[in-house]
Structures are given as structure tokens and as C-alpha cells.
Amino acid sequence: MVALSFYIMYPLFYYYTRKESRYHKVAKLRKIWCDIGFILGFYSYSAEYEVDVDFSKPMIIVANHTSYLDTPLICTIISGNYHFMGKVELLKNPVLKLFFQTIDVPVDRSNRIASYRALKKVEENIHKGFSLILYPEGTMSKNPPEMGEFKAGAFKLAVDTKVPILPISFLNNYKLMKGSGLKYGSRPGIMRAFVHKPIETSNLSTPEELENLSKQIFETLKSKL
């Protein structure tokens, strides 16, 4: 249903992703797109916020990843300008490739030079006021709600750019649609999320502090699963 609603809105997405000066409209369009998809699929959602979050300032938003519902849900419960970072294979996705060819940043982890360029592009976007959304596991969990080992990229980016990290726990998406839903099926229901308070990184710099930050985020996300 999310794919169907995407094609309904494709002309608008195409127009607003053609020029960087129009990117600030994309987040609102994504929210409308995902809300339509949820209505068509008989999904609703509930998000609890630990504190009021100022989404007008750039941050790095991280979440556990268990379902194809995660990305559309995150688009509906946050605001402000943002972009995603994801594996280069998403360029082959018929729905997502439009975004990863324009506003979002694909990363080829098998190519160090390409990975470096992707990280520099993300840093540029953050300095322009765009938050970054990524899944620190780098892939979907194979045994939800358990999380896999985190990649260091998100936390190094946060320390390098001195922006806070906003952890979001998706509590039950995998129960409604595990993975893509093709193998185990899917069912309508209420998706639930918990938006934790932002974690500051401006005073961090050493490798030890970076490792501790990763552990802190892991435990923060895990605390609500």
C-alpha cells in the first residue's frame, strides 16, 4: 500500500527532488505519502515522546530495524528537514531509488572510497540543516526484538559534526510485518514507537567516548523493546 501511494504522488516527488533548493518540501510530502499508505493498509500509529524535541535543529536519528514499516513510521513521527543514509542496494528499489538518487545518500560499505564520499556528503547535509536518519545495525534484525551489533558510522558522524543523537525504539512493528512481510505475512494494527530524549555529543572526542556512546544508544533503544 505504501508503494501504491508512492506512485500516486510520484509527480510531486519527482518535481521536488530535481533541485536541492526544493528538498525542504520533501519531508512533508513523505509524511503525506506514508499516512496515505497506512490508511490504505489499515494501520495506525502511536508515538510517545520522552521530552519535547526541537526538530528544527539537525541531529542524527537512529532506530532499531525490524520491519518495512519502520521507515514510513519514522517519516510520520518526526518533523523538520531530514535525509536517509542506506545501503547502495536501495538504488535498485523501484520506490526508494528516486530518493537515493537525489536527497538521500547511498553507501557502498565494500568500497572505502565510496563510503568516505558518502560520509562527507552526509556531513555537508547536516551542516545545511538536514537531520540524518539511519539504522545503526546496518540491516534488519534477524531475530527481533533483539538487535544486532551496531556499526560505528552514526556515532562517529555525531561526534564529528557535534550534533545530538535522537534514539527511537520501534516496539511492535515486527509483530505486524516482520521484514518485508512476504515470508511471514502482515496484519493491520497499531504501530507503537518511543522517542527518547536526545543525547548530546558536543563534548565527546576520544575513541573510548565513541565506544561508550554506541553502548549507551544500544541500551537506550533496548530499554523499551
Model-derived features with residue positions:
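Generic preference for hydrophobic
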Residues: 47, 61, 84, 134, ...
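Short acidic-hydrophobic, aromatic-tinged amphipathic segments that line or gate anion-handling sites
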Residues: 47, 105-108, 201
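Membrane-interfacial terminal anchoring regions of lipid-handling membrane enzymes
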Residues: 1-18, 24-28, 51-54, 124, ...
